[in-house]
Curated annotation (Swiss-Prot):
The gene is MLP329. It comes from Arabidopsis thaliana. This is MLP-like protein 329. Gene3D superfamilies: 3.30.530.20. The lineage of its organism: Eukaryota, Viridiplantae, Streptophyta, Embryophyta, Tracheophyta. One of its GO terms (cellular component) is mitochondrion. GO terms for biological process: defense response. Belongs to the MLP family. It comes from the Eukaryota. GO terms for molecular function: copper ion binding. InterPro entries: Bet_v_I/MLP, MLP-like, START-like_dom_sf.
Length: 151
């Protein structure tokens, strides 16, 4: 049986949790202009930008290498949670399960957090653990912070 695991981290943010949630929920098309050093393109494959179960294709750079990721988005507005379920792409060559969960919380007027949870399962025991992807995701969320504040 292949190894599986869960990584969890929190990224402190500025502004409002609602504004950050809206950017991640509805405005993925703005990511390449805002953080092009991480995300070079996002296209809708099926559905709409803001629709539950929309399928999108992301072009990004992780560890200096261009990669592609196809995901299905799940939305939980009540809890300000967005889940991207991995379907295809570079990361899916090594992982059988790759779910990314972003939860935005306004703890106080000056204390906003994005909790990132990555649930993963390797295809084989020989595949590396995806810790580099968690580092990448944390950097994407942190770098998007300034752009959300300016919006």
């Amino acid at each position: 049986m292949a190894t599986s695991g869960t990584y969890v981290t929190e990224v402190p943010l500025k502004g409002s949790a609602d504004k950050h949630y809206k950017r991640w929920r509805d405005e993925n098309h703005l990511f390449p202009d805002a953080i092009g050093h991480h995300i070079q393109g996002v296209t809708v494959h099926d559905g709409e930008w803001d629709s539950h179960e929309a399928i999108k294709i992301w072009n990004y750079t992780c560890d200096g290498k261009p990669e592609v990721f196809k995901e299905r988005k799940e939305i939980d507005d009540e809890n300000m949670v967005i889940t991207f379920r991995g379907l295809e792409g570079h990361v899916m060559e090594q992982l059988k399960v790759y779910d990314l969960i972003y939860q935005f919380s306004q703890k106080s007027p000056d204390d906003i957090v994005c909790k990132i949870t990555m649930i993963w399962e390797k295809r084989t025991d020989d595949s590396p653990e995806p810790s580099n992807y968690m580092k990448f995701l944390k950097s994407v969320v942190a770098d998007m912070d300034e752009h959300v504040l300016k919006a």
